[in-house]
Amino acid sequence: MAVGTLEHYESDGIIILPVFPNWAMLGAMLALKGPAALPWISNAFKATGVMVKIQDELAGEIYPDNYLYTSSKNPSDQDKKRLAKGAGIVRQVLKRAGASEDSIMELKPSGAHPSSCCRIGEVVNIDLETRVENLFCCDASVMPESLGLPVVWTAVSLGKRLSKHLDSQIN
């Protein structure tokens, strides 16, 4: 996911990246589409993947459930507009590259990298510590708003910063 179209659609809250799910995930995604997707399974090895990632609106809930926490976030109207615009751009590019309309399959949006549920300044302080002493949170959930970008480098940077802070507390 290193190459994308950030500079072209960032102001719209959209990036387009070359991504392909692993075969197990693809099989599950196709199965969720129902019987109409069965012909695609045999030709999946010929497919390529393009992901539309958006900067979604902050919404959703986290539910405590005994030992697990589940979450729910339905796309807002603005989220749906951004996804539709991005999918339209991808469809147009694929057609210009020679793909026929019936060779393009659009999968349902899937959530990944939930963010902004433990925002810095609200749930954690600038050192990523919660109100519970020595309990830290260090992932995309501390971001003040949805990044709309892959979060790996940001999360790694936060982890390095936190490790330096914790090291300074010990030494």
Model-identified regions with their sequence ranges:
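FAD cofactor-binding and catalytic pocket of flavoenzymes
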Residues: 1-88, 124, 131, 144
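Glycine-rich loop(s) and the adjacent beta-strand/alpha-helix scaffold that form part
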Residues: 1-9, 139, 164-169
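Composition- and surface-driven signal marking solvent-exposed, interaction-prone regions
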Residues: 43, 149-150
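Short helix-capping/linker segments at secondary-structure and domain boundaries
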Residues: 57-63, 97-101, 167-171
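A glycine-rich dinucleotide-binding beta-alpha-beta segment and adjacent secondary-structure elements
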Residues: 81-146, 152-156
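An active-site-proximal "capping" alpha-helix that borders the catalytic cofactor pocket
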Residues: 153-169
